[in-house]
From Swiss-Prot:
Cofactor field: Zn(2+); Mg(2+); Co(2+)
Organism of provenance: Serratia proteamaculans (strain 568)
Entry GO terms, CC: cytoplasm
Annotated localization: Cytoplasm
Cofactor comment: Binds 1 divalent metal cation per subunit. Can use ions such as Zn(2+), Mg(2+) or Co(2+).
Subunit organization: Homodimer.
Protein known as: 4-hydroxythreonine-4-phosphate dehydrogenase
Keywords, ordered alphabetically: Cobalt, Cytoplasm, Magnesium, Metal-binding, NAD, NADP, Oxidoreductase, Pyridoxine biosynthesis, Zinc
Misc remark: The active site is located at the dimer interface.
Amino acid sequence: MHNNNRIVITPGEPAGVGPDLVAALAQQDWPVELVVCADPALLLERARQLDLPLQLRTYQPQQPAQPQRAGTLTVLPVATAHPVVAGELNVGNSAYVVETLARACDGCLNGEFAALITGPVNKGVINDAGVPFIGHTEFFADRSGCDRVVMMLATEELRVALATTHLPLLAVPGAITRQSLHEVIRILDHDLKTKFGLAQPQIYVCGLNPHAGEGGHMGREEIDTIIPALDELRAEGITLIGPLPADTLFQPKYLQHADAVLAMYHDQGLPVLKYQGFGRAVNITLGLPFIRTSVDHGTALELAGTGTADAGSFKTALNLAIKMIINCNE
């Protein structure tokens, strides 16, 4: 286990289900200290609404970390600017959301925390406040000074990484270059080894076009870009299979051998993974100088404060982060 034995959590949008799920996480023992970067009053009020017992302890960075006991959380206080009503967005609290992300990220960068787990945010309301925000992945990459990070979603049975993330489909072909594939695949291979404990990961790669281009008859990106890039990376010792047509690759005879699949764009790979394991999937940012996992769902405003939100994805994200910490220290 990591020396500091602490994991920092950002609940995300205060009006969404993030605070509910954090309160639910607190209902069991954990082998690490859970430091929640949030408004203490928000956490206590949401726990009261859900009729969940919760005691808060103020984060003391100079004290040794302690395993988290059921019914308790450690809190790193950040105040909301306006009162929070479950289910009702308030643009005035957008700066609060960004502040929690910044503080948690900085704590990971300076070694306070072994990992960061994020709850869902509402990108629209943050941008409405005049704060440019594409997403967690891009925010943490920029704050960490990383030129390239990789988005990967994982269930127990399948890991899918993305060569491109939040781009319009029209922009995807131009964003896939030999250089970008080199960077993405090197990060993917490195983190599968160091954070997932895989000695020689097998990475299966999707083509961009239908039928992986059909020998150039349905697009030349495979011939001109993807195949040469994969050949160059194979020469470095990375195990790569493909490019294969996506509708072929996502079949058991291939997936049973795959440690990870690299999809060329967001909606090529993620629908399959989410159909297979929605609510059990974890979003992981590879290439950061720290471990970051997240839930695979949104803010679910209509469920906030009702007691009906499922904490399964949050628990899975936390358990995976703990496993990754152990792998990094072996």
